[in-house]
Design a protein with these regions (language model features):
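C-terminal helical subdomain
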Residues: 190, 209-246, 253-255
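Short, small/polar-rich loop/turn modules that mediate ligand/substrate recognition or access, typified
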Residues: 182, 187, 246-248
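Substrate-binding pocket helix/loop in short-chain dehydrogenase/reductase
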Residues: 104-106, 110-115, 216
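Active-site helix of classical SDR
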Residues: 129, 166, 174
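Short C-terminal tail/terminal secondary-structure segment
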Residues: 2-7, 100-103, 155, 236, ...
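Canonical Rossmann dinucleotide-binding motif of NAD(H)/NADP(H)-dependent dehydrogenases/reductases
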Residues: 7-40
């Protein structure tokens, strides 16, 4: 049986990954490169992008980097155009970029937090997915969309109000797209990581006491934190032809936390 984690199962394909300079996104970029794909890593952090390019210099032009504000529709659409111009095609898009909300319950949340979370966590996914679907339809060969949702897109008590709402919406968007375009060869799935060792929580300098207490119920001692490599392994599988009949799925990767 072919080893999906070390063989070039994406050879000849091109992938775009947002939030691709760190954490889960960086690990997905590495997995895809190792699997033979060309990859455009998009991120807001220019220093992290430069470090990524240097770290993976052995891949040469197979890795392209682009500073992209995913809350900007034109920037997201331009990102896809750049990948197509660079490599002649795009076969896979991973809408991975996201931010958190300090676990704020609704009574502690202001409008700015809500609007920022929706722009980055939801609008960006819609922009990337819509652009990809239009491109795939024009090309007529199908394609793969992977959206990073979260355990908070399935379990309402694992995050703040805005974060949870944004991730539930990502799950709904994913399933709708999968069903609407299933007859075109387009597959759209979501990965739903639980607690993972990444830098997404760096911005949570003052998490809500109520939110933290509620969100971590049942977690202490239940399971360890996941690693970006464990999440990216699932993304690679979903991107490959071995997942050819998997569409509209939400793949939970949480070590059993959601079983509580």
């Amino acid at each position: 049986m072919q080893d999906t984690l070390s063989s070039p199962i994406l050879a000849g394909q091109t992938a775009v990954v947002t939030g691709g300079a760190s954490g889960i996104g960086k690990s997905i970029v590495q997995r895809f490169l190792e699997a033979g794909a060309n990859c455009l890593a998009a991120d807001l952090n220019e220093e992290a992008l430069a470090a990524l390019k240097e770290e993976f210099a052995a891949y040469g032009d197979k890795l392209d980097i682009a500073r992209v504000d995913v809350s900007d529709r034109d920037a997201v659409e331009g990102m896809v155009d750049r990948a197509v111009d660079m490599y002649g095609q795009m076969d896979i898009i991973v809408n991975n970029a996201g931010i958190m909300d300090n676990l704020l319950p609704i009574a502690e949340m202001d409008d700015d937090v809500w609007e920022r979370l929706m722009k980055v966590n939801l609008n960006s996914v819609m922009y990337g997915t819509r652009k990809a679907v239009r491109y795939f339809l024009d090309r007529g060969e199908g394609g793969v969309i992977i959206n990073t949702a979260s355990l908070s897109g399935l379990c309402a008590g694992r995050g703040g109000c805005a974060y949870t709402a944004s991730k539930f919406a990502v799950v709904g968007l994913t399933k709708n797209v999968a069903f609407m375009y299933a007859d075109t060869g387009i597959r759209c799935n979501a990965i739903c990581p639980g607690n993972t060792q990444t830098n997404i929580g760096v911005g949570m300098r003052q998490p809500s006491e109520r939110g933290m207490a509620k969100a971590t119920t049942g977690y202490a001692g239940a399971t360890r934190s996941g690693t970006p490599e464990e999440i990216s392994a699932a993304a690679l599988f979903l991107a490959s032809d071995q997942a050819g009949f998997i569409n509209g799925e939400t793949l939970t990767i949480d070590g059993g936390w959601s079983a509580y």
